[in-house]
């Protein structure tokens, strides 16, 4: 049975402070709705979801989470942003859609801590924060989405990136390249083109055909356009080279965001 819980008051909410939302252990979390006022989403920085002190997902600012929800056309409302652990865009193959979506719920049975951490910018006018949890019967953490970001320098011309982590047994659902000058991207595995060099306009149109919103200054390689987990890239031990070839019209720093999926463990990725 799904239930709804007003989470405890968030301590240390003030401009310039670091804060943590501590989720009660023993529940399975489907969605966390974070309400905010007196602070902009861009002023809530270095957002980290941690299980037992280990990073699960990170966002440069809370606005990046809003953009993630925008891309999937999830409900967006001013003054609140939602952490969707259950993924409503997923479609079942051998199971129902609901089973597939709930497979990614954040179980906490057996954990010691489960936290959402962030920093509040010193320029925030008068921040106020509260959170509501949508939760269900407790389970241990299993399949989860793990969002990681990396910063790379792009050249005016072609830049090859071949050092993204390849944790064996995990999957890649999507790769996002956030940079204004990205013109086209090719994706290779062990020298084989999985995705040819596609111009951003052509890639954007493909995303739109599958019901995804296109984000400004972002080139998204979505391996699960139909919401099918089996279309994602399985990182097996045979893969020796995973490579992005990025054509850019300027020298700039890019944020590379990789959405990994896999079974969480204390000793895992």
Curated annotation (Swiss-Prot):
Keywords annotated in UniProt: Capsid protein, Virion
Highest rank taxon of the organism: Viruses
Subunit structure of this chain's protein: Homotrimer.
Subcellular location: Virion
Tagged with keyword Cell cycle: no
Described function: Major capsid protein.
The protein, known as: Major capsid protein P2
Isomerase recorded as keyword: no
Cellular component annotations (GO), alphabetically ordered: viral capsid, major subunit
A Pfam short name: P2_N
């Amino acid at each position: 049975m799904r239930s709804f819980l007003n989470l405890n008051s968030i301590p240390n909410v003030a401009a310039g402070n670091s804060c943590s939302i501590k989720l009660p252990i023993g529940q399975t979390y489907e969605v966390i709705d974070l309400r905010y006022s007196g602070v902009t989403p861009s002023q809530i920085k270095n957002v980290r979801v941690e299980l037992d002190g280990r990073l699960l997902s990170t966002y440069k600012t809370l606005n990046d989470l809003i953009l993630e929800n925008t891309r999937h056309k999830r409900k967006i409302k001013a003054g609140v942003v939602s952490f969707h652990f259950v993924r409503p865009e997923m479609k079942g193959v051998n199971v129902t859609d609901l089973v597939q979506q709930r497979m990614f719920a954040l179980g906490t049975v057996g954990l010691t801590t489960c936290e959402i951490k962030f920093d509040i910018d010193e320029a925030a006018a008068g921040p106020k924060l509260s959170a509501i949890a949508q939760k269900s019967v407790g389970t241990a953490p299993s399949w989860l989405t793990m969002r990681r970001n990396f910063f790379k320098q792009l050249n005016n011309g072609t830049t090859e990136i071949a050092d993204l982590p390849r944790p064996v047994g995990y999957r890649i659902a999507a790769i996002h390249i956030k940079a204004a000058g990205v013109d086209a991207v090719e994706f290779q595995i062990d020298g084989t083109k999985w995705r040819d060099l596609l111009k951003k306009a052509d890639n954007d149109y493909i995303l739109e055909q599958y019901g995804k919103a296109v984000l400004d200054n972002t080139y998204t390689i979505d391996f699960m356009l139909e919401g099918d987990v089996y279309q994602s890239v399985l990182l097996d031990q045979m893969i020796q080279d995973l490579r992005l070839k990025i054509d850019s019209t300027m020298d700039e720093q890019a944020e590379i965001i990789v959405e990994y999926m896999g079974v969480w463990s204390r000793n895992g990725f």
